[in-house]
Amino acid sequence: MVIEPQLPAAALSALAELCRRYGRALYVAEPCGHMVPDARVVVSTALSGGTLRQRLRDACRRFEARRLALDLACVRMDFSLPAPYGTGTALTPQQLTELRGRRTVFFSPELCARYFTYEQSGMTHFVLFDDGDTLHRKIALGTELGIPAGFLALPEAMEALPRLLGKG
Protein backbone atom coordinates (compact mmCIF):
# COMPACT_ATOMS: atom_id res chain seq x y z
CA MET A 1 0.00 0.00 0.00
CA VAL A 2 1.39 3.41 -0.99
CA ILE A 3 0.43 6.50 0.98
CA GLU A 4 1.43 9.73 -0.78
CA PRO A 5 -0.10 12.60 1.19
CA GLN A 6 1.00 13.23 4.73
CA LEU A 7 -1.53 11.66 7.09
CA PRO A 8 -1.88 12.02 10.86
CA ALA A 9 0.33 9.64 12.86
CA ALA A 10 -2.70 7.75 14.23
CA ALA A 11 -4.00 7.02 10.71
CA LEU A 12 -0.56 5.87 9.57
CA SER A 13 -0.21 3.60 12.61
CA ALA A 14 -3.60 2.02 11.89
CA LEU A 15 -2.66 1.45 8.24
CA ALA A 16 0.71 0.03 9.25
CA GLU A 17 -0.99 -2.44 11.58
CA LEU A 18 -3.35 -3.54 8.80
CA CYS A 19 -0.43 -4.02 6.42
CA ARG A 20 1.46 -6.07 9.03
CA ARG A 21 -1.60 -8.22 9.67
CA TYR A 22 -1.95 -9.05 5.96
CA GLY A 23 1.76 -9.33 5.21
CA ARG A 24 1.88 -6.23 3.06
CA ALA A 25 4.39 -3.39 2.94
CA LEU A 26 3.34 0.17 3.63
CA TYR A 27 5.05 2.85 1.52
CA VAL A 28 4.86 6.42 2.80
CA ALA A 29 5.95 9.83 1.57
CA GLU A 30 9.30 11.00 2.88
CA PRO A 31 7.86 13.49 5.42
CA CYS A 32 6.03 10.54 7.07
CA GLY A 33 9.06 8.25 7.19
CA HIS A 34 9.75 8.74 10.90
CA MET A 35 6.12 8.19 11.91
CA VAL A 36 6.05 4.48 11.05
CA PRO A 37 9.41 2.80 11.78
CA ASP A 38 8.77 -0.27 9.61
CA ALA A 39 7.23 1.55 6.62
CA ARG A 40 9.09 1.90 3.34
CA VAL A 41 9.92 5.52 2.52
CA VAL A 42 9.40 6.81 -1.04
CA VAL A 43 12.14 9.25 -2.11
CA SER A 44 11.84 11.26 -5.31
CA THR A 45 14.73 11.22 -7.78
CA ALA A 46 13.56 14.49 -9.39
CA LEU A 47 15.91 17.37 -8.57
CA SER A 48 16.48 20.84 -9.92
CA GLY A 49 19.56 21.50 -7.78
CA GLY A 50 22.12 19.78 -5.60
CA THR A 51 23.20 16.23 -6.43
CA LEU A 52 21.15 13.07 -6.58
CA ARG A 53 23.93 11.04 -4.96
CA GLN A 54 23.99 13.34 -1.91
CA ARG A 55 20.18 13.46 -1.75
CA LEU A 56 19.99 9.66 -1.66
CA ARG A 57 22.89 9.37 0.81
CA ASP A 58 21.10 11.77 3.14
CA ALA A 59 17.90 9.72 2.85
CA CYS A 60 19.88 6.53 3.57
CA ARG A 61 21.29 8.12 6.73
CA ARG A 62 17.85 9.27 7.89
CA PHE A 63 15.92 6.07 7.16
CA GLU A 64 18.38 3.24 6.30
CA ALA A 65 18.75 2.20 2.67
CA ARG A 66 16.75 -1.03 3.10
CA ARG A 67 13.64 1.04 3.96
CA LEU A 68 13.81 3.24 0.86
CA ALA A 69 12.07 3.04 -2.49
CA LEU A 70 12.89 5.41 -5.35
CA ASP A 71 10.17 7.43 -7.03
CA LEU A 72 11.69 7.29 -10.51
CA ALA A 73 9.92 10.35 -11.84
CA CYS A 74 10.33 10.80 -15.59
CA VAL A 75 10.91 14.56 -15.53
CA ARG A 76 10.30 16.86 -18.50
CA MET A 77 10.47 20.45 -17.20
CA ASP A 78 11.09 23.83 -18.80
CA PHE A 79 12.57 26.40 -16.38
CA SER A 80 12.71 30.13 -17.15
CA LEU A 81 15.97 31.45 -15.74
CA PRO A 82 16.53 32.53 -13.12
CA ALA A 83 14.39 29.90 -11.34
CA PRO A 84 15.00 30.65 -7.65
CA TYR A 85 12.31 28.24 -6.42
CA GLY A 86 13.26 25.34 -8.69
CA THR A 87 9.86 25.18 -10.33
CA GLY A 88 9.24 24.96 -14.02
CA THR A 89 6.56 24.07 -16.54
CA ALA A 90 5.88 20.39 -17.18
CA LEU A 91 6.26 19.35 -20.82
CA THR A 92 4.51 16.61 -22.76
CA PRO A 93 6.74 14.23 -24.74
CA GLN A 94 5.67 16.06 -27.92
CA GLN A 95 6.55 19.48 -26.49
CA LEU A 96 9.95 18.18 -25.39
CA THR A 97 10.63 16.78 -28.86
CA GLU A 98 9.65 20.08 -30.51
CA LEU A 99 11.76 22.20 -28.14
CA ARG A 100 14.72 19.85 -28.36
CA GLY A 101 14.91 20.11 -32.14
CA ARG A 102 18.58 20.17 -33.13
CA ARG A 103 19.81 21.63 -29.87
CA THR A 104 22.84 20.13 -28.18
CA VAL A 105 21.79 17.96 -25.23
CA PHE A 106 24.04 17.51 -22.20
CA PHE A 107 24.08 15.02 -19.33
CA SER A 108 24.35 16.28 -15.74
CA PRO A 109 25.99 13.65 -13.50
CA GLU A 110 24.94 15.72 -10.47
CA LEU A 111 21.23 15.66 -11.34
CA CYS A 112 21.46 12.37 -13.24
CA ALA A 113 19.35 13.96 -15.98
CA ARG A 114 19.71 15.43 -19.46
CA TYR A 115 19.31 19.10 -20.27
CA PHE A 116 19.55 21.77 -22.94
CA THR A 117 19.02 25.52 -23.07
CA TYR A 118 17.28 27.86 -25.48
CA GLU A 119 16.25 31.50 -25.69
CA GLN A 120 12.76 32.78 -26.35
CA SER A 121 11.52 36.37 -26.17
CA GLY A 122 14.77 37.47 -24.51
CA MET A 123 14.45 34.84 -21.75
CA THR A 124 16.85 31.94 -21.25
CA HIS A 125 15.21 28.58 -20.65
CA PHE A 126 16.73 25.45 -19.10
CA VAL A 127 14.99 22.19 -20.04
CA LEU A 128 15.64 19.23 -17.76
CA PHE A 129 14.46 15.76 -18.75
CA ASP A 130 14.80 12.04 -18.18
CA ASP A 131 14.99 9.20 -20.65
CA GLY A 132 15.64 5.47 -20.45
CA ASP A 133 19.36 6.01 -19.89
CA THR A 134 18.96 8.54 -17.05
CA LEU A 135 16.35 6.39 -15.30
CA HIS A 136 18.65 3.38 -15.69
CA ARG A 137 21.47 5.41 -14.08
CA LYS A 138 19.19 6.42 -11.20
CA ILE A 139 18.28 2.77 -10.61
CA ALA A 140 21.99 1.84 -10.69
CA LEU A 141 22.81 4.58 -8.16
CA GLY A 142 20.03 3.37 -5.88
CA THR A 143 21.32 -0.20 -6.16
CA GLU A 144 24.88 0.97 -5.39
CA LEU A 145 23.59 2.65 -2.22
CA GLY A 146 21.59 -0.43 -1.16
CA ILE A 147 18.13 0.90 -2.02
CA PRO A 148 16.11 -2.21 -2.88
CA ALA A 149 13.00 -0.86 -4.66
CA GLY A 150 11.65 1.78 -6.97
CA PHE A 151 8.47 2.95 -8.64
CA LEU A 152 8.08 4.00 -12.26
CA ALA A 153 4.92 5.89 -13.27
CA LEU A 154 3.19 4.98 -16.51
CA PRO A 155 2.35 6.33 -19.04
CA GLU A 156 4.90 9.12 -18.27
CA ALA A 157 7.84 6.72 -18.53
CA MET A 158 6.50 4.60 -21.40
CA GLU A 159 9.20 5.79 -23.82
CA ALA A 160 11.91 4.73 -21.33
CA LEU A 161 10.66 1.16 -20.91
CA PRO A 162 12.59 -0.44 -23.80
CA ARG A 163 15.92 0.81 -22.37
CA LEU A 164 14.97 -0.20 -18.83
CA LEU A 165 13.93 -3.66 -19.98
CA GLY A 166 17.15 -4.13 -21.97
CA LYS A 167 15.40 -3.93 -25.35
CA GLY A 168 16.64 -0.58 -26.55
Regions found by a protein language model. Name each.
Residues 1-48:
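Chitinase-like catalytic core of GlcNAc-active glycosidases
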Residues 8-17, 48-58, 90-93, 132-136, ...:
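Well-ordered, non-membrane alpha-helical segments in soluble/globular domains
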Residues 8-13, 78-83, 158-164:
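Extracytoplasmic/secreted cell-surface and envelope-processing proteins
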Residues 18-24, 59-67, 137-148:
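A structural motif corresponding to the C-terminal end of an alpha-helix
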Residues 32-34, 55, 130-143:
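Short, acidic/polar
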Residues 39, 53-57, 63:
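Residues lining hydrophobic/aromatic ligand-binding pockets adjacent to catalytic sites
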Residues 65-137:
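Glycan-binding loop/region signatures in secreted carbohydrate-active enzymes
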Residues 138-168:
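Acidic/aromatic/glycine-rich contiguous surface patches that form carbohydrate-binding/processing clefts
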